[in-house]
Amino acid sequence: MLFRSALATAARRAGLLSNTPGLVTMHMGDGEGRLDPIFYVLDHSDVPAKNLLPTHILRNPGLIDAGADLVRRGGYIDCTAGADDVEVESDALKLYELLHREDVSLDHVTMSSDAFGSQPRFNEEGECIGLTYASPKYLHRTIQILVREGMPLEDALQLLTSTPAVLLGKEGIKGCVAEGADADLLVLDENLNINSLFARGKVAVWEQEVKMKGRFEQ
């Protein structure tokens, strides 16, 4: 625990010296300790809760409960979108329920994904048979599900826009539509399907046709 406190303190100090958030991002697993290491740091050091960001909070009910407690203490949590068509539905419903708990502020919850990160593939015996990658489409799908369940679109979008921008010290640059900000604009149709996309003012997708391609794309 002392090592974790020292790590968080070092990250905060580095952030102060470099004028950056000094954020420690932690990938949470299924362990019984849940967010205990984070609460230990908050109880035994002067590191602010905003410097500690646990991810994959939707992994299990106990972790969700601990995440809600962290938000109530002024901390931030990151909820990872599901990685397949089945998981994205269940995780989106977990997120919807979490956001409607008492004293869980939307201003302190972000959403991310494992987009393009490698993922193991397993057979029916649980043996790893190869690798695949996670798709970014499940962030978009999660937004659609949240709105379907009754969340206002502007609230759902905040998980991916203004809240992470504030947390990462990019307020007024990312996550907003404003003069002088990066012109990252997503145009949705009436069914919240992607119609067009602008990345820093350049057309990446226009009326569902990809215009901006990577180095190895045709």
Region locations from a protein language model:
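Short, surface-exposed linear patches
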Residues: S45-P48, G74-I77, H100-R101, L131-R141, ...
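Active-site core of metal-dependent hydrolases
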Residues: A8-P120, C128-I129
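His/Asp/Glu-enriched, well-ordered alpha-helical/loop segment
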Residues: R101-L188
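C-terminal cap of metal-dependent C-N hydrolases
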Residues: V166, E171, C176-Q218
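Short, small-residue-biased leader/transition segments that mark boundaries at the very start
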Residues: M1-L2
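Residue-level "edge-of-site" marker
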Residues: A83, L159-L160, N193
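Short secondary-structure capping/turn micro-motifs that flank functional sites
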Residues: V86-V88, S162-T163, S196
